[in-house]
């Protein structure tokens, strides 16, 4: 429908003295009833709308008979003239197009479509005219840019404060100062911008979006590095914990070894055998057993004195046939001594007699270079010198060195007797 013809028809209707219905204006009301689009302002078609409303109510009252039967006691019965005046008064007080204009135009174009009685028809019209909200014609049709809608109602506003937006509804307004958000540009339902003003607002927003993306990417770098550093710190902490566990295990193993050594020392003190010889090399084993009498003398001083007094007489007797005495009895006596001394010995203790025989054979050959052999020979020399002093004649140190067999036999007898005494005491 062309707006120019509509405006000419409205002007002609206003100029007429006698008001008559117009075909062009009736088509205009039918167009509003179908589409709801008001192509012109309220002031332009208000006169024809009031004329058409009054004529329809009169025609309906003339064509439709009065209500038959008794009236409903719950419904107030209002005369036709009073109801008509009330409706016309409300419509004349409008400052804009009511938002129920489409329904009102339907009632004006087809009054008997839903109603048969005059009273019900008037009540339906009254319900649709008793509204407050108003709408205004769209900017696309009448060329007016200062048109806005809020909740389906057209409102006159300033384009500097609001722009038309069709995202959440047919025309939801949006203030222009909200440019911080990247999605603040007004878009239609099809994704296209509404006007050139919105295109201008999109350019700074695009820059802000790129800057925000760049800042986000810049922030992501240190965050990733911090995460890597955190993983490295966690790995270092795990490595330190593993080292601490290993150190603890080593400490526990060392403590266990020390405890075992302490137990072995206690067993050696009880059995009176030097278990320390087991941990030494075989050469040390062959050298240490030469001086069992020295270990016994350090263990008990009283037993040494008794053994010296008792063995002095025997040594004086044994010194004369020492040159012809074989070494077999000495070996036998040492074997019995070791058997008594270590009844629960290991394989190393069983091998000691043979090592002792070899050491006795090496000792008189003049091997006195190592300090261990000297320490082992000193007690035997001291014992032989003490026995010679207690006997009839004094002997020199050269005689004791020249006759090693005599010292060995005497020390063997001395050791045998001194070993028998502690066993008897135990």
Curated annotation (Swiss-Prot):
Coiled coil: none annotated. One of its GO terms (cellular component) is cytoplasm. Pfam families: PPP4R2 (PF09184). Residues 182-215 have a biased composition (Polar residues). Residues 332-342 have a biased composition (Basic and acidic residues). Residues 234-244, 256-270, 348-358, 417-426 have a biased composition (Acidic residues). The modification Phosphoserine is found at residue 370. GO terms for molecular function: protein phosphatase regulator activity. Residues 161-426 are annotated as: Disordered. Keywords: Phosphoprotein. It comes from the Eukaryota. Residues 381-408 have a biased composition (Low complexity). Regulatory subunit of serine/threonine-protein phosphatase 4 (PP4). Serine/threonine-protein phosphatase 4 (PP4) occurs in different assemblies of the catalytic and one or more regulatory subunits. PANTHER family: PPP4R2-RELATED PROTEIN, SERINE_THREONINE-PROTEIN PHOSPHATASE 4 REGULATORY SUBUNIT 2-B. Belongs to the PPP4R2 family. This is Serine/threonine-protein phosphatase 4 regulatory subunit 2-B. It comes from Danio rerio.
